[in-house]
Amino acid sequence: MSSVYDGNLTVSIFGQSHAPAIGVTIDGLPAGLPVDLDALGRFLRRRAPGQNAWSTPRKEADLPEFLCGLKDGRTCGAPLTAIIRNTNTRSGDYENLMDIPRPGHADYTAQVKFGGAQDAAGGGHFSGRLTAPLCIAGGLCLQILARQGVRVRARIVSIGTVTDDAAFDAPVDEKPFPAVSDEAAAAMQAQIAQVKAEQDSVGGVIECVIEGLPAGIGDPMFGGLENRIARTVFAIPAVKGVEFGAGFAAARLRGSENNDPFCVENGKIVTKTNHCGGILGGISNGMPVVFRAAFKPTPSISREQDSVSLSRMEETKLVVYGRHDPCIVPRAVPCVEAAAAIAVLDAVMERKKELGYGY
């Protein structure tokens, strides 16, 4: 199972939604880096379930236990492993899913891939629960990047038909609902409440901005910065699309409209616009890196759906039980930050190797 990000950093995520624990092992972190466990805890709480009306009622403390890799509050050079114990599981809600797969979920493809050996409870290894260890790894990477002047921040751009058009010039990480406009946030919450009452779900779009990244980070072709970021962001369950800068809208522009003119500002080369999203030829150009990730609606919904019985090879009806988010987008905001931070730190480490100096 491909649950390992392998670069200058190696990030291996393990566990299942209803297993005794989930966790992550990170190899390649330089020794001696300080780790702020309080800040990491605050970051993980932004993703934690059971905190409000628009998330799953499953409550988990999500307290990381570091088994190795830390000594006296600093990385010690050894692989770092942390786990989060699962304490609130109801596996009985999922017993029928080995035979009747949920539409939109990985139940059927997992059955084909693993021949019935997979753990279906809570979605098993395919569950959004596995974004908790992703956030442990990404939270540590965020701290390392911040000490180098690189800031990664994300916000909700849209949920369903509601869009937040406000400029991303205010922090949202301490808001209970991470949208810039409070008016848009209220409308988004109302839409989530509506689909929840209708036993349905809704998706949305998250925007991420990476500031302070110098020019020259990344590579052409397969090692491009877009490639690295997209690869990690697609590890988040429910992500169905990633676009950088103007993204798909660039296909409707002319070159004279899409090109970002260069200029000199305070002795530094910058661009007057940022349609490229801070990346040219797979390499950062010194402008903010901007991308958006599209999230599909949560596939586990309570209304009756059409499916099939795999054992009987006939069509049947399915009602999904269990505890699920009517919209996973609000809790996914720190996950996008975490995924981006892993990719960016890996690319920064690559650049330092190219320049011939240590971390």
Q: Model regions: which residues?
A:
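N-terminal, positively charged regions that mediate nucleic acid binding
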Residues: M1-R58
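A short glycine/serine-rich beta->alpha loop
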Residues: T10-I13, Q118-L130, A215-D219, C276-I279, ...
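Glycine-rich anion/phosphate-binding loop at the beta-strand->alpha-helix junction
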Residues: F14-P20, Q199-V202, I206-E315
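Internal helix-turn-beta structural module
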Residues: H18, S300-Y359
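Alpha-helical support elements that line or immediately flank enzyme active sites
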Residues: P20-G32, G128-V150, G223, N227, ...
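Glycine-rich, N-terminal phosphate-binding loop and its surrounding beta-alpha-beta segment
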Residues: L44-T109
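Short acidic, glycine/tyrosine-flanked loop/strand segments centered on an H-E-D-like triad
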Residues: M98-G124, D306-H324
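Glycine-rich, mobile lid/loop segments that gate access to catalytic sites or pores
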Residues: K113-M221
